[in-house]
Amino acid sequence: MFKIKLTSKAKRELRKLSKEEKLSIGEIIEELKENPLIGKPLDRELIRKFSYRVGIYRVIYKINQQDKIVKILSAGHRGTIYN
């Protein structure tokens, strides 16, 4: 099982979400603890990062396999997550 770490940016983004949105993102994070490779590998300026989607929500993250850490970089609505 992987540990989850959130960047300060991800924490700020999560604070802005509604309770329902936070629950959806929380489900994504729980799944990433078990299997962080289920996300889609990103490319271009986001190389070595992953995106995991549930409905209209996305979580952008990096994986540290050696230390078993998933670092959440950004979380929120798919329309604003890549800005």
Describe the residue ranges of each PLM region:
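Enriched for short, Lys/Arg-rich terminal
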Residues: 1-23, 31, 54-57, 62-83
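A short, surface-exposed loop/turn module that caps and links secondary-structure elements
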Residues: 29-52
